[in-house]
Amino acid sequence: MQERHTEQDYRALLIADTPIIDVRAPVEFEQGAMPAAINLPLMNNDERAAVGTCYKQQGSDAALALGHKLVAGEIRQQRMDAWRAACLQNPQGILCCARGGQRSHIVQRWLHEAGIDYPLVEGGYKALRQTAIQATIELAQKPIVLIGGCTGCGKTLLVQQQPNGVDLEGLARHRGSAFGRTLQPQLSQASFENLLAAEMLKTDARQELRLWVLEDESRMIGSNHLPECLRERMTQAAIAVVEDPFEIRLERLNEEYFLRMHHDFIHAYGDEQGWQEYCEYLHHGLSAIKRRLGLQRYNELATRLDAALTTQLATGSTDGHLAWLVPLLEEYYDPMYRYQLEKKAEKVVFRGEWAEVAEWVKAQ
């Protein structure tokens, strides 16, 4: 039997993106999992619930016996086939259950009996989760430079191009605004935090990291919130503000929110449904800020959005969207960001166009 991993190996597992065969039930996996994990459960949700009830009422021996009864015969063979295939596909991987207890040991023993020696995480997901939390707390203590600027200034791209940059919006699968959702569903809060910790560990391990470059985010990115330890450090960080011309910002927003999102929806759903999903996405974004816009202004912009979509469907041109996007920026997004920036003006250490800020960041 291969040697099992202990505490000293947990960070190395996250840094290396070690494949993890997570044998917890799907409901546990959905609540929180490690980035490189695949869910091949020993018991499904119903089986786990039945065993849990049995444990409370009759004790551990009866629960164990019920578990073996439920996962037997053809069911056991199907799951063994899946574990065997995953082990062969991921020879450097590792088994994981909730706490490194009976479930991962049972699967490990069954695999051993089938001729496959495969290690497990001693301490299970709980140990990896605690490692991720502690790593984030420690790494967040390094200095931080935030990239700020109005919508469309290319902040995310600038962060992505820095070797010490961490794309918080990319990890959260959300661009942080009313129109920020992507076609990928957001992760659970715990899974997002685990992914963030792994990304910070990998970035830190690649270089002698002196500071982090992050986008100036609010506490919430869609449905995910930043870990409090990182958020607290970000409120104290220096800010470099990108101030690009309005026309350049419009070009970026056209590319990102109209051309790219239209392409992505069509690619994912096909022409007809993809178009409907794209229209719904834009209307949902505008509707999300209806109360702040006021009903009259919202209705005006929604009418312009409908006209722009009609033109885009007929001609392929996205130019019509400027009729509602420009006033949305001028009357809502830009004033809101400038107001937020005024409250932390003393933290602004540099201002310039995109290339100037990128050059300044590299010099830090």
Swiss-Prot record:
Catalytically driven reaction(s): 5-methylaminomethyl-2-thiouridine(34) in tRNA + selenophosphate + (2E)-geranyl diphosphate + H2O + H(+) = 5-methylaminomethyl-2-selenouridine(34) in tRNA + (2E)-thiogeraniol + phosphate + diphosphate; 5-methylaminomethyl-2-thiouridine(34) in tRNA + (2E)-geranyl diphosphate = 5-methylaminomethyl-S-(2E)-geranyl-thiouridine(34) in tRNA + diphosphate; 5-methylaminomethyl-S-(2E)-geranyl-thiouridine(34) in tRNA + selenophosphate + H(+) = 5-methylaminomethyl-2-(Se-phospho)selenouridine(34) in tRNA + (2E)-thiogeraniol; 5-methylaminomethyl-2-(Se-phospho)selenouridine(34) in tRNA + H2O = 5-methylaminomethyl-2-selenouridine(34) in tRNA + phosphate
Enzyme nomenclature, EC number: 2.9.1.3
SUPFAM superfamilies: P-loop containing nucleoside triphosphate hydrolases, Rhodanese/Cell cycle control phosphatase
Keyword Transferase attached: yes
Pfam families given in the database record: Rhodanese
GO function term, MF aspect, one: tRNA 2-selenouridine synthase activity
All residue ranges annotated as the Rhodanese domain in the record: 14-137
Active site: C97
Keyword DNA damage included in the entry's annotation: no
Keywords, in A-Z order: Selenium, Transferase
InterPro entries, alphabetized: P-loop_NTPase, Rhodanese-like_dom, Rhodanese-like_dom_sf, SelU
Any one biological process term the GO annotation gives: tRNA wobble uridine modification
Oligomer status and interactors: Monomer.
Task of the protein: Involved in the post-transcriptional modification of the uridine at the wobble position (U34) of tRNA(Lys), tRNA(Glu) and tRNA(Gln). Catalyzes the conversion of 2-thiouridine (S2U-RNA) to 2-selenouridine (Se2U-RNA). Acts in a two-step process involving geranylation of 2-thiouridine (S2U) to S-geranyl-2-thiouridine (geS2U) and subsequent selenation of the latter derivative to 2-selenouridine (Se2U) in the tRNA chain.
Protein family (similarity comment): Belongs to the SelU family.
Protein name, per record: tRNA 2-selenouridine synthase
Organism field: Escherichia fergusonii (strain ATCC 35469 / DSM 13698 / CCUG 18766 / IAM 14443 / JCM 21226 / LMG 7866 / NBRC 102419 / NCTC 12128 / CDC 0568-73)
